[in-house]
Design a protein with these regions (language model features):
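A compositional/structural signature for long, glycine/proline-rich flexible linkers
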Residues: 1-313
Length: 313
């Protein structure tokens, strides 16, 4: 399990770097996984999301059903889907962290990078049902390539035609903050608040965003560029997520305790039969090593965290 760019340990990620030949068409044939959430998201070389198609937006194949719709049968046997991967950029940006009412998608836009034409997708599965494998019992989507002359390719022929073994092209800053810059930020933070900074007591929470506001917890500058106040624009972020971070330090004490009211979410881990509504689709707590590495230590997601009779944990 590769751990960089702040992953959630309750999630499995599969990445693809490829180049669709001129005039060809690519689509994916898959089966909806037995899980809390799945999505396909395309990215640029800076790790910023370009387009996202979440599970509930995907139209199932004729005769199949989408188990991610409210009230749907999560254990339906017929759960296939097909989605086209197009090379053109998306004309209208996807709303960040917003449930899209009454929409369906049969395409995901994955434009090539200006530098080398490489296209990038990440397939995510959050909180697979208990006793399922890494794909939550669904297998991985199958790529199907139709060449300009109409010939259809599958299997290894697709991989060769897509140059799918090409190295991933990305800016290193998409995975973690460069060490030299982070050292400067730490010096600024300690000058502001002492040797435990950027940790504070009580903790200071910051919303991750594009622009320098991501580092407000170091600098104290909470200025957010126009249009980015709801975004987390790099580190291969998920367009359906919002991220809030803080730092802790044992200079403030041996134990850090969090008490809060838990948002409601669908219950899925034990193979629940119906897909329920909730305040959120999913939430989790993650312990990470900070901006220097982007690595995760451990996470707990909602169904793993005990709550009391009043919904507090």
């Amino acid at each position: 399990y590769i751990t960089f760019a702040f992953p959630d340990a309750g999630t499995f990620y599969w990445g693809a770097a490829f180049s669709v030949p001129k005039g060809a068409k690519l689509h994916l044939e898959g089966s909806f996984p037995h899980a809390r959430y799945m999505s396909l998201i395309s990215y640029d070389r800076l790790g910023a999301p370009l387009d996202s198609v979440a599970d509930y937006l995907i139209a199932p194949k004729p005769g199949a059903s989408n188990p991610y719709l409210f009230g749907a049968d999560r254990n339906s046997k017929q759960r296939g889907y097909k989605i086209e991967v197009v090379s053109e950029p998306l004309s209208t940006p996807i709303p960040w962290g917003v449930y899209q009412e009454a929409k369906t998608r049969d395409k995901i836009h994955a434009p090539g990078q200006a530098e080398n034409g490489q296209q990038q997708l990440i397939y995510r599965i959050y909180a697979g049902d208990k006793n399922t494998d890494e794909t939550a019992g669904s297998g991985l989507p199958t790529p199907v390539l139709t060449l300009a002359d109409g010939k259809e390719l599958r299997g290894q022929d697709v991989c060769a035609s897509l140059s799918s073994f090409q190295p991933l092209s990305f800016d290193q800053a998409a995975l973690a903050t460069p060490r030299e810059y982070l050292n400067k930020l730490t010096e600024v933070a300690k000058a502001r608040g002492g040797p435990a900074m950027p940790a504070s007591n009580p903790p200071t929470w910051s919303k991750s965003s594009e622009s320098m506001s991501r580092y407000a917890i170091y600098t104290g500058d909470n200025t957010v560029a126009s249009g980015t106040n709801k975004k987390d624009g790099t580190f291969f972020a998920n367009l359906d997520n919002q991220y809030v971070r803080t730092f802790i330090n044992r200079k403030h004490g041996e134990v850090f305790v969090i008490r809060a009211k838990a948002p409601t979410t669908p219950k899925t881990y034990n193979g629940n039969t119906k897909f329920e509504d909730g305040d959120l689709r999913y939430w989790s707590w993650c312990s990470q090593q900070g901006y220097a590495s982007g690595r995760v230590n451990k996470c707990l997601f909602d169904e793993q965290i005990p709550v009391d009779a009043n919904g507090y944990y």
